[in-house]
């Protein structure tokens, strides 16, 4: 059976803006009932009014609290998209709170929410789990040690999860976007800082591009699992960050 004929409910985290918002809209247009989880109530309410998407206002820093909000939902598609880059800084310039926050959102919440939803997917013998990774988890970049490490952890987790699920009709896909125009970098670098460093004179992937690719992977037959989707602007190369040795 074509998976889109039996997938009914999707949960998308980090859906207030950027890639998560675009994915929520794309899945709603495909006919799924979409639960959009995020912190921005106004943004989620707008998704509800424009596309009938169900808002779930929540901060994933304590993911166990979200279980009650999705109780009774038979989730067929889980999109672990929420991510946090607190600052673009070297390790010694990050606070311990910065480190804890990135680990909480980028790793702990992903592992726990996936475990929770996966139990019901196994019982119903159907489902597709997506992870939004990052090119920052594929190669080292300056001022990105903790963020890159969290994304590398999710990448290995995604691959290992496929091993756990071998023999079950549940698919796992990781998205690897390169330079994409979202609030993630605006939060870390500031609006003008992100514009100058990343977007001026550079073409960037748009969130809608990632959403379309996710839908393509989702719509393939059950026996076809796109395990990784690595997407870069044509002018970007992973590991191409320029670094210079500084005297101390």
UniProtKB/Swiss-Prot annotation:
GO molecular function: oxidoreductase activity
Enzyme class at the top of the EC tree: oxidoreductase
UniProt-annotated binding residues for substrate: 134
InterPro entries associated with the record: NAD(P)-bd_dom_sf, Sc_DH/Rdtase_CS, SDR_fam
Source species, domain of life: Bacteria
Binding site for NADP(+): 8-32
Oxidoreductase in keyword set: yes
Keywords annotated in UniProt: Oxidoreductase, Plasmid
EC numbers, comma separated: 1.-.-.-
Catalytic center residues: 147 (proton acceptor)
Pfam families: adh_short
Family listed: Belongs to the short-chain dehydrogenases/reductases (SDR) family.
PANTHER family per UniProt: ALCOHOL DEHYDROGENASE
Protein name (database record): Uncharacterized short-chain type dehydrogenase/reductase y4eK
Organism: Sinorhizobium fredii (strain NBRC 101917 / NGR234)
């Amino acid at each position: 059976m074509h998976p889109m004929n039996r997938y009914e409910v999707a949960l998308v985290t980090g859906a207030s803006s950027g890639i998560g918002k675009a994915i929520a809209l794309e899945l709603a247009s495909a006919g799924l009932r979409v639960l959009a989880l995020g912190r921005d109530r106004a943004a989620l309410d707008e998704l509800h009014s424009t596309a009938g998407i169900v808002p779930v206002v929540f901060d994933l820093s304590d993911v166990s609290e979200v279980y009650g909000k999705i109780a009774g939902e038979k989730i067929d598609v889980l999109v672990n998209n929420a991510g946090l880059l607190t600052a673009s800084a070297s390790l010694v310039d990050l606070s311990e709170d910065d480190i804890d926050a990135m680990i909480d959102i980028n790793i702990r919440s992903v592992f726990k929410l996936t475990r929770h939803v996966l139990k019901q997917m196994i019982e119903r013998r159907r489902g597709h789990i997506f992870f939004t990774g990052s090119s920052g988890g594929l190669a080292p970049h300056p001022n990105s040690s903790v963020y890159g490490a969290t994304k590398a952890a999710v990448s290995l987790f995604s691959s290992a999860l496929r091993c756990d699920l071998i023999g079950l009709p549940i698919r796992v896909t990781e998205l690897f976007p390169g330079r994409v125009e979202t609030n993630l970098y605006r939060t870390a670098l500031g609006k003008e800082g992100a514009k100058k460093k990343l977007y001026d004179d550079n073409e960037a992937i748009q969130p809608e591009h990632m959403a379309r690719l996710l839908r393509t992977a989702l719509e393939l037959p059950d026996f076809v699992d796109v395990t990784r989707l690595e997407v870069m602007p044509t002018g970007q190369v992973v590991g191409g960050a320029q670094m210079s040795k500084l005297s101390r």
